[in-house]
Curated annotation (Swiss-Prot):
Keywords: Cytoplasmic vesicle, Hydrogen ion transport, Ion transport, Membrane, Synapse, Transmembrane, Transmembrane helix, Transport
GO cellular component: clathrin-coated vesicle membrane; melanosome; synaptic vesicle membrane; vacuolar proton-transporting V-type ATPase, V0 domain
Similarity section: Belongs to the V-ATPase 116 kDa subunit family.
Cytoplasmic side: 1-388, 427-441, 555-572, 659-724, 810-837
Domain of life per record: Eukaryota
Vacuolar side: 408-409, 472-534, 594-638, 750-770
GO molecular function: proton-transporting ATPase activity, rotational mechanism
Record text on subunit structure and interactions: V-ATPase is a heteromultimeric enzyme made up of two complexes: the ATP-hydrolytic V1 complex and the proton translocation V0 complex. The V1 complex consists of three catalytic AB heterodimers that form a heterohexamer, three peripheral stalks each consisting of EG heterodimers, one central rotor including subunits D and F, and the regulatory subunits C and H. The proton translocation complex V0 consists of the proton transport subunit a, a ring of proteolipid subunits c9c'', rotary subunit d, subunits e and f, and two accessory subunits.
Membrane-traversing stretches: 389-407, 410-426, 442-471, 535-554, 573-593, 639-658, 725-749, 771-809
Task of the protein: Subunit of the V0 complex of vacuolar(H+)-ATPase (V-ATPase), a multisubunit enzyme composed of a peripheral complex (V1) that hydrolyzes ATP and a membrane integral complex (V0) that translocates protons. V-ATPase is responsible for acidifying and maintaining the pH of intracellular compartments and in some cell types, is targeted to the plasma membrane, where it is responsible for acidifying the extracellular environment. Required for assembly and activity of the vacuolar ATPase.
Chain's gene name: atp6v0a1
Pfam families linked: V_ATPase_I
Topological type in the membrane: Multi-pass membrane protein
The protein, known as: V-type proton ATPase 116 kDa subunit a 1
Amino acid sequence: MGELFRSEEMTLAQLFLQSEAAYCCVSELGELGKVQFRDLNPDVNVFQRKFVNEVRRCEEMDRKLRFVEKEVKKANISILDTGENPEVPFPRDMIDLEANFEKIEIELKEINTNQEALKRNFLELTELKFILRKTQQFFDEMADPDLLEESSSLLEPSEMGRGAPLRLGFVAGVINRERIPTFERMLWRVCRGNVFLRQAEIENPLEDPVTGDSVHKSVFIIFFQGDQLKNRVKKICEGFRASLYPCPETPQERKEMATGVNTRIEDLQMVLNQTEDHRQRVLQAAAKSLRVWFIKVRKMKAIYHTLNLCNIDVTQKCLIAEVWCPVADLDSIQFALRRGTEHSGSTVPSILNRMQTNQTPPTYNKTNKFTYGFQNLVDAYGIGSYREINPAPYTIITFPFLFAVMFGDFGHGILMTLFAVWMVVRESRILSQKIDNELFTMMFSGRYIILLMGLFSIYTGLIYNDCFSKALNLFGSSWSVRPMFTDTWSEDLLKHTSVLQLNPNVTGVFNGPYPFGIDPIWSLATNKLTFLNSFKMKMSVVLGIIHMTFGVALSLLNHIYFKKPLNIYLGFIPEMIFMTTLFGYLVILIIYKWCAYDASTSMVAPSLLIHFINMFLFSYQDTSLPMLYKGQMGLQCFLVVCAIICVPWMLVVKPLILRRQYLRRKHLGTHNFGGIRVGNGPTEEDAEIIQHDQLSMHSEEGEEPAMEEVFDFGDTVVHQAIHTIEYCLGCISNTASYLRLWALSLAHAQLSEVLWTMVMHVGLSIRSLGGGIALVFVFSAFATLTIAILLIMEGLSAFLHALRLHWVEFQNKFYMGTGFKFLPFSFENIREGKFDE
């Protein structure tokens, strides 16, 4: 349970794998997913490593599978996913897989080539069929006298004078419909109006044999005179990618050709159907095994990639690897190595040897489906340093609670909870569907965050007594107006006063606090906002200071664990004193005033703001301002002096002690060896004992002795000054930052009230017969706006503000976030279908 609050303890281990067993051992480690391999060949080009040929073969198989997958998806065939996790094939099985994939690829390419040729032939015959059909109509129109008059410009004047018969040449073809207007203008300009074009649309779209898209085309016939115009027309048709077809001149020949074309189309359609059936059978057979093939190939590829990270022994019989792994999983890792050795048939066992290192290990926080989302929220700010306190367990409660303080509405909380419950209940089915929608996937990953946000919103909504901007009268109001009529309000007062105030000092008016939350009578009061603003503002300050103080307290656990006594005495203690003497005292004042003053003494209750300002100014001369309690002046002066003392305590003392320790080590001749200091001085982070940790995160090179420790007093003073100023000013600014809890809560309540008043109230106010029908549309609009504005937009706003309060105001008190994530070699992503590497 303790590891939940810190990252797992990691160790660097060395693996000695026999060459014949290395493949199977790495395979078992990939199934386990608990080791992160280090690259022991950083200076070797990826194309010069030992297993580069095997990687290329896997990539070639992967390419063939992607081709098959593309063809399967193009045919709208679903890929079978049984959730099976196939075992990694042995290296000797790669030849069979390659042959199988090669056979499928060649067969599919042959089918596609033949099918494309058949479809192209089918398209040509179909176009010819429409040409023969349409041209007959064109030739029938040639007998029309109007056509002769329209085409008279095609004849030479001498021929017209001699009354020679009209002898015109023609070409017929098919062109894309959208090119017709440009095509017609080009013919007219190039041929100077000496051609006659007739065109008709083909009603049914034709299929492009290459892309498979539907294309709309038109049939055209061009009449001209002379070979020169004929050549021009053909060149223009070629430029516009029009398909020209031979068309007989006599009706009888056209009829005979049409009959032959129809017969060939029928035969070709039969062949096309048979080809498509065969293609479907091949693709359906491939679709059944495609996912398994993908997993096998990509597991093999991942294994060979990992083997390329290892060193080869000089005898070529052993591979040496270095891995980061959790100490708690060493037994399971050794068991996986034994299992891999047995599968390979090797008689020499693999060896796991723990290594001593001064390099910073990666950070590994174990998660489950519930804590996964909260850990991601923390990691988005920065990966925690190795073994420091993990904020995620505390964030599980504080994050949804602070969100709910801003979002608090009973009705909206129920809607959010129902949505989260739906995702949680159906999570298995949703996971199996592998939805690609990025927005939904993101929300589904945070389903438990949304669930807790909804539950806490219900809780805070009950405290605020706010449900869709309306109060719930669950227990009956504790206020009564009847005593005011009998004892205080006269008839004359009632006639001339529009706003009346209930006096809690009158017996019977106020009967004690409401059992839970805000009394519903406040929803009717004109000073509702005044009361709620005061309550929420003070509550925000109290919650914020408690949250920050808890963050400072967590820093103590880090200092104790890392054995840094200087940070405790010169960091944690003055920080905690500074926080509690000023802002902790403010919380006590707020609670004290709530308890010390009731309705009868509220008129003389002093202002906390004035008292708090006077506390810093040491201003107590104003006798008209009553004290909150006896001895207040002396206590407040003492608290301010303590807070002031904490500033030089944090600023000056630590650099001086570090300098004194450095001079003492230098005098005694103490040196650093391999990053580990040998001497009498206490361990301290600012002395930079392990100097090359940051470099090791990037270089991952072999361990080298660290250089002799260098201490710069000026840098240390500047660093400490920045930290002190940041903390002292941060306490003030961060406390003010928590007022966003009040501001967003107010905004959400006001938006909810506006939406009810402007939409739902209007629908409920209609008294006519059509009011019921109108209410249906009004409620639809109300529900849509509620979800879009109040749940999604306002919810996202509250989410981001709660995130900021955790990242900045809370985590900066104890969380370094300068580590790097543990990225184990694992087949999990491959099993889940996330094939992209």
